Amino acid sequence: MLKNFAVLTALIASVTLAEEPYAFRARLEIVHESGLRDAALKPAADEFAFADGVKVDDADFADYLNVSMGVKASVGRNGAVVATIDDGLRDREYVVEVRKDGVEIRGADGRALHQAYYHLEDLMNLRRAPFLKLGRERRRMRFSPRMIHSGYGCDVFPDNYLKRIAHHGFDAIVFYIKDVNRTAAGPNQDVNGLIERARKVGLDTYLYSSVSCFAHPDDPEGKKKIEASFGRIAKAHPGAKGIVFVGESCQFPSKDPRVQPVRHRDKNHDDPRPLAGWFPCKDYPDWLRAVMDVLHRHSPNMEIVFWTYNWSRQDAKLCADLIPNFPDGVSIQGTLGNGAVTKHDNGLVCHCRDYTVSTPGFTDHYAAQAKAAKAGNRRFYTMANTAGLTWDYGVAPYLPCPFQWKKRWDGLKDSQYGVAGLMETHHYGWYPSFISELAKEAYTEGGMDFDEHIRKIAARDFGEANAEKVMEAWRKWSRTEVNYVANNENQYGPFRIGPAFPYNFGGKKILHAEFPQDKRAYHTMRWMAILNFPFDLEQAHEQNIAFVELDDDYRLKQLELFERMRTDFADGVKALKEAAQTLDGARRAKAEEMIGVGEWHQRSVETAINLNRGYLAFKRGDREEVLKYARAEYANAQAALKLVERDSRLGWEPSMEYAAGPEQIRWKLRRMEELYGSALATP
């Protein structure tokens, strides 16, 4: 009876609210949203207004006026906007002057001019009308590149999505390269076509090396293997701006006695030495020099970026001391957050294992690398995740904690680190949100003040009367993110796949093959997530995850923090729901989408709470408590099922595909029904 009721409930929800799988992609291809104008608004005395019949010399901007603002505009010269290239401006710089009779734009080049037009669009979106305040602005993007992976599909970039990326201020894309015309999207990809399509909308292309070439340059066949792999790629794709190397993806048989000279799959777990990919080996500079020589033979201007991500658990000085030995011209990329040690206010200490925004992330490790790069006059990049997402929640579209993100944006602008460029997302990709909108302005010299900007966004999206209520919800969500505990058990466990994570105390060990994952996924669950709670040494070895057993005191302190998070997320959701009740049309729909994102975070935290409480009860043999939290988690998963049916982006991640979608959550519910039966019914 319970099973039939759950299925019936799910079917009713799916009929009334369900969005087809991948329906969110249609939203990603909307370059200009329709109907953004509030027809009741009139221009002020100090504003210029675009009127019907206006001519502008940019087709994209004309489309914006027509579609978003309802202004009948056409493309033509000597119209309301005059745009010219000014050689006297710095790279990426533009000047906008709004007068009573029109707008003048000067840009350092074509890309700068396009960013100027996008800025005009942003201003009118905030105004909700085709009006611009009179005055003069000088603006410049602080960082270049600002590169992102695709949030449409793993290494999939349709034309309109590329345009959307450019509108949000990013200036580069990055995708996996495995071989000539082979990416994470599969073989026979038109890589050069993608490079050209990106170039046409003002985006550079970086290749993320996932090339299989286990070779040492000092070995007899080593340089031949390097030429046969990296040389082929550079020759085939010379239009790429650069290539990114990271330890785990460029393993080689190092001769450094401090490491195991084998591939990851051949690691000896009884040998305490790390693998070459996870250690600053003394012969990394030799390997890089050999690869660089081959790449530049075929593509002389291809930039080489070495990302130190996998070194975060090694001695900071050891890592920084190796950087001066790298070949000249190699850019260094550090990582924010990884390796940070956070002490929470209840005494819990967390060693942050992977990408997190629970801390701004400016560790001594990161600072030492930045200093070494600066001393050697090298370009220093940062893996910042500031497109809006980290591994804190694996299948959410973005983390809605703007005031916490601000700490990172502000830190990156600090000149002591000398940051030149950013990687702003890994393979979990980019989804447009108010977070990336705020980041764009924060990363612009001459940009709008943060407090002013976020207040205008709140008023635009939820109405002036609701702005303060919405701001307070965002403050709560931001404040509570510092309570997140970024250890491996959380990031590879309940927070990776949220309410799809199994509650299985008393059941058989779950095998990865049992999990209903799309077989086309680039990353399988065997690599991406632990499905048993808590995970054990065997699972950790299988996935090369640092295993740290958590004692009961740690779990209880962690639960204190999680329960705060649950309250704060729930309070924020409640406030936004109240605000949304006053809205209608597209504004209401967008508000409900954000509410769903907030509630997904709330439900994910609830899953973590129920798992920890259930485990502690199971450990002490308290079956009634196990069942109590089983019922709580069953209800939580049912509520989450409605969320993922309503918004097809929730529960999805580009490399994992649907890891917590309707199918996965229903699978979890069925397992719980089989394991606990009628005990799941509310007493």
Can you say where each PLM-predicted feature lies in the sequence?
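Sec-dependent signal peptide recognition
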Residues: 1-8
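Hydrophobic h-region of N-terminal signal peptides that target proteins for export
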Residues: 9-18
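Contiguous, structured surface segment used for ligand recognition
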Residues: 19-141
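Substrate-binding groove of N-acetylhexosamine-processing glycoside hydrolases
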Residues: 24, 235, 274-683
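Structural motif
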Residues: 32-35, 47-55, 83-87, 106-108, ...
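Extracellular/periplasmic catalytic domains that process cell-envelope and extracellular macromolecules
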Residues: 97-99, 141-142, 236-237, 324-327
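N-terminal small/glycine-rich loop or linker at the start of catalytic domains
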Residues: 134-151, 207-214, 381-391
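Substrate-binding cleft of carbohydrate-active enzyme catalytic domains
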Residues: 147-306, 317-325, 331-333, 412
